Each structure stands twice: as structure tokens, then as C-alpha cells.
Amino acid sequence: VALSTYKWDYAPYLLYMKRRLKERLYLPQTFVRDGVISGQVTIQFRLLRNGNVENLKMIENRGHSAFISPTLNTVRASNPFKPLPNSFPDPYLDLTWTFVYSIY
């Protein structure tokens, strides 16, 4: 996750986001059944104060392209997140996340 420095305690909120994304990650069983594949997908999106996601896009893919759709769908399934903390100083938070996959 790439963040600017803000005067708010972002660690608990980002840990919440990470848990929520992991809970909603779905990889087709064929990925596991077919053996070794790996990939890395970097996405960007804007998180509004109310927790809604906007402007979700894939910005980089390394490795197997089959991970792109599940990555984007994971964020869609997690939307909305809980609202940003009251101490967050801006109307939105731009985030960059990298999902790293290794299936053996």
C-alpha cells in the first residue's frame, strides 16, 4: 500500500482493509488444481470518506494474467469499506495496493 504521510492513525484502518480484502478474495480452484502459477497485480482506487470505492483500475500486472479479474473483483466485493476515521483530514484517500500470488 502506498500512502502519503498524514496526521492520522492509519495503521488500524489499513489492517481492517487488508483483512476485509483477504476475506473476500476468491481464486478459482483451477488455479490450485493446475499447479504452479504466480503473479502480481497492482491496482489503484480512490476511497471516499464514506468508505465507497471509486476509480478502481489495474495499473500493472506481472506474471499470470488470470489474477487480474479476481483482484479487481475482490475490491468490488469489499465495497463499501467502513467510513474513514473522523481524524482523516481529506475528502478521499488515493490508494495503491499490490496483490502478490504464489500458488504451488
Region spans (language model):
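Short, small/polar residue-rich loop motifs at catalytic or cofactor-binding pockets
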Residues: 36-42
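Intrinsic-disorder/low-complexity signature in envelope-associated proteins
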Residues: 1-20, 30-33
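Active-site phosphate-binding and catalytic loops of NTP-dependent enzymes
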Residues: 27-33, 83-84
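A short acidic/small-residue loop/turn micro-motif
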Residues: 60-66
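Conserved "boundary/linchpin" sites in short secondary-structure elements
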Residues: 1-4, 19-25, 46-60, 72-83, ...
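A short glycine-leucine-enriched loop at secondary-structure breakpoints
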Residues: 34-36, 88
